[in-house]
From Swiss-Prot:
The gene is TPMT. This is Thiopurine S-methyltransferase. It is found in: Cytoplasm. Gene3D superfamilies: Vaccinia Virus protein VP39. The modification N6-acetyllysine is found at K58. Signal peptide: none annotated.
Amino acid sequence: MDGTRTSLDIEEYSDTEVQKNQVLTLEEWQDKWVNGKTAFHQEQGHQLLKKHLDTFLKGKSGLRVFFPLCGKAVEMKWFADRGHSVVGVEISELGIQEFFTEQNLSYSEEPITEIPGTKVFKSSSGNISLYCCSIFDLPRTNIGKFDMIWDRGALVAINPGDRKCYADTMFSLLGKKFQYLLCVLSYDPTKHPGPPFYVPHAEIERLFGKICNIRCLEKVDAFEERHKSWGIDCLFEKLYLLTEK
């Protein structure tokens, strides 16, 4: 054995408090879109979701699917093309516009009456609605409950000090017999300040354990050449399924 860690023996890093005071403002996230600093976007979609999607959907149609901090995630069109209703929230209007443009979807925009100064973008087909606002303002819009949440790049982007508020927001959107698919990253948080932030299993239990059954479905090596600039040499991604207790 050469000592290389595999996707099945990932350790939890003990120094989980080192990132707790890290803060990125909404304006800084918007600047990332304006300046093209969106390496977190996956042009081909998320491979773990693609692998498990049909198993999760079980042939159902007409589900309501929520994408927190959606950006221009191509997976939104995957669900819409399968007959589901997609709702996303994203602070960057540019990111939302790029989604519709890159997916060749016509759309309209209208003000969100409950949140002055914000807009919702709706596909002409009517099954994709993307709200351009802070996720913490979203419950004011009465958008209803969801059958499924796809959380990739959301919890790991939320400032650590806001995670409890974020989890409570997610709980307010969950319908009966929900499936909450959650991706988190595992790396040494003493070497990279984030975002994306390190979210250990214990944190998921703390945030969601009282209401959800929590199961880790898969762990994969997600390290890429660009991650060397973070000062790390190891990065794993974990896919969790959260269901109603």
